[in-house]
Regions:
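Extracytoplasmic/secreted cell-surface and envelope-processing proteins
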Residues: 13-16, 43-44, 61-64, 133-135
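Append "and occasionally in soluble cytosolic enzymes with long acidic Gly/Pro-rich linkers
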Residues: 1-23, 27, 35, 110, ...
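Solvent-exposed, polar/charged alpha-helical surfaces in well-ordered, non-transmembrane soluble domains
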Residues: 16-19, 23-27, 42, 86-93, ...
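Short, solvent-exposed loop/beta-turn-alpha elements that line the ligand-binding surface or hinge
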Residues: 43-48, 68-97, 126-157
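Alpha-helix N-cap/loop-to-helix boundary motif
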Residues: 13, 36, 56, 80-84
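Bilobed periplasmic-binding protein-like "clamshell/Venus-flytrap" ligand-binding domains
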Residues: 1-9, 55, 99-134
């Protein structure tokens, strides 16, 4: 058995994850051909892959719907593997018309459980990020979501 693994080098953890999987599966006789390329999109487009490992921010604005609409639905632009779930599509219809944050959170839990039950996605790592700034930068604080480091408190003296 050979698994064709596609990833890219611009996120430091992705090549390391590929190498770890490759070494671990080799121990049980499974070969993993790793293709780590900045041109990963060409490989995805060709369909000549079995596993695509990519990094993304699941909830950049704190709203749980983002991940599902970008990655998990029939019309999602990043649904690389062509995943489909009637249940998930129905839950998303409900999510679209639900505005209460507690209810949206409950729907998000159901949606998450659906993709986990289907083994549609494997969440394998978490990015370790360092923030470095030039001398004189003040008010820069790390935040779990990419968009919230730039605040009214950020300044350069």
């Amino acid at each position: 058995l050979t698994i064709r693994w596609v990833t890219y080098p611009s996120r430091q953890e992705l090549p390391l994850l590929a190498e770890s999987v490759q070494a671990t599966l080799k121990e049980i006789g499974i070969k993993v051909d790793v293709n780590c390329s900045a041109d990963f999109q060409s490989f995805l487009d060709s369909g000549e892959w079995d596993i695509y490992a990519g990094a993304f921010v699941c909830a950049p604005t704190g709203d749980p719907e983002y991940f599902f609409t970008t990655h998990c639905l029939d019309e999602s632009s990043k649904n690389r593997g062509g995943y489909h779930s009637d249940k998930l599509e129905e839950l998303e219809k409900e999510m679209k018309s639900t505005f209460d944050t507690d209810e949206r959170a409950k729907l998000a839990v159901q949606m998450t459980q659906t993709i986990l039950d289907d083994n549609a996605f494997i969440f394998a790592s978490h990015l370790k990020m360092s923030i470095v700034s030039a001398k004189g930068v003040t008010g820069l604080e790390a935040h779990p979501c990419d968009y919230y480091e730039i605040t009214v408190n950020l300044d350069k003296n």
